[in-house]
Curated annotation (Swiss-Prot):
It holds the Pfam family RuBisCO_small. Keywords: Calvin cycle, Carbon dioxide fixation, Chloroplast, Photorespiration, Photosynthesis, Plastid, Transit peptide. Heterohexadecamer of 8 large and 8 small subunits. This is Ribulose bisphosphate carboxylase small subunit, chloroplastic. Its main location: plastid. CDD domains: RuBisCO_small (cd03527).
Amino acid sequence: MASSMISSATIATVNCSSPAQANMVAPFTGLKSASAFPVTRKANNDITSLASNGGRVQCMQVWPPLGKKKFETLSYLPDLTPVQLAKEVDYLLRSKWIPCLEFELEEGFVHRKYSSLPTYYDGRYWTMWKLPMFGCTDSAQVLEELENCKKEYPNAFIRIIGFDNVRQVQCISFIAYKPKGY
């Protein structure tokens, strides 16, 4: 009903607009032709002209899948020396993470014994050695606790984890000790 209430004077004003007013903005004429720009493409279909490493790398051997159990981060490396362990713990402390020691007496490697659900990343549950080391500022304290755990459980896998108490997540985890034969 509102459309029927427009006066005839308004209709006359709309009809009086000149064609010059409708063309005040220049129309979009599109992008420029690609032929206006110089072409610098190399017309070579030879596959050997693609990226190369200069022939420095030939065939690389893959990691043998048999007899190599995966434990934790850095498990593909040889066992860490006490100096290397101290450097890892120093990194953990510099990152403001809380060090904690955990041990496992049966299977220190990844398995799906308890659950195949994706709720826990590998189905393992480790026992905590004492409490997390809140307030620890020196890697020697952590390594001393590692030695105490080794004396108490010589046949256990022992790992050091770094816990971020702000985000409440485990940020780092690596094997610090493996029993003989692993």
